[in-house]
């Protein structure tokens, strides 16, 4: 008598003999290729932006043809060709005996002032100029305010996904601090043991892989932020119509706050003290808000490793150094740069709040951030 019954019509194939779905295999190959293409595309874009930022920075320092001046009709200016509108605020013309370099609205090329001005500064300056001219007679320089606001809005819209990715990476890093602390405690006294150090490094890498953490992704925003700052800086300092504006009939956008306070204090320069009291705190707040919101989101994940504490400390120091440098630049630059800085800080605060509520909402609903990032193509 047989111990088992086998149905001839039912055949079970071992796993190793099961046929592979060719469509699935093809799809996986396509996805893999697309990921590689996306990776190298992002690498190329970031490298290009970084190099263009360096190009613009060095060109600003050494090229006399792109230097700016607070005096109208002097230095490099962007506007319409002479005689186009009949309005001296918009038509480019030099002052008497001034070194002058006209960058007109018809010069969309890289042969005159290089790729940084041709590819990046020109589109931004043209956008602001196109907004300001139809509104040229509005009160208090609101045309300049609107022009810079729209430029920043478009830039922030383009870079929003990068900001989300950077924030998500920081979020995940905060969430695994407890596990990192456990790994560091486990290998606390292995500084001279190369094998154990390698094992510790391997466990850390496995943890990063599990939570899809890419340490360098948190610095992506920096590669984009600095070139953008330089681009908008050049836009607001070379636009001729901005140089003639008194914002709210109080602050001359072509004037340097530091120069006005130190050399013209009793003759109206004192108003720039209030200008700085608005500009500088707004930027400090915009830097603190993301940190405060991150602490609220991760109130239960406070167990930081020593390495985590050191990294957080270094991050705070570097942010402080950058802040001090930017304050120095803004204080001695034309007030138009301060106006841009103020609007930028408002965008940063709004962006931080939006991302915060998005993350909290996802956590409340129990939706995996990983899944949503895949849907958005951010991961």
Curated annotation (Swiss-Prot):
It comes from Malacoplasma penetrans (strain HF-2). It is found in: Cell membrane. PANTHER family: CYTOCHROME C OXIDASE ASSEMBLY PROTEIN COX18, MITOCHONDRIAL, OXA1. The keyword Transmembrane applies. Signal peptide: none annotated. This is Membrane protein insertase YidC. Required for the insertion and/or proper folding and/or complex formation of integral membrane proteins into the membrane. Involved in integration of membrane proteins that insert both dependently and independently of the Sec translocase complex, as well as at least some lipoproteins. Aids folding of multispanning membrane proteins. One of its GO terms (biological process) is protein insertion into membrane. Its main location: membrane. It is a multi-pass membrane protein. The keyword Metal-binding does not apply. Keywords: Cell membrane, Chaperone, Membrane, Protein transport, Transmembrane, Transmembrane helix, Transport. The chain crosses the membrane at residues 36-56, 115-135, 144-164, 213-233, 235-255, 265-285, 322-342. Belongs to the OXA1/ALB3/YidC family. Type 1 subfamily.
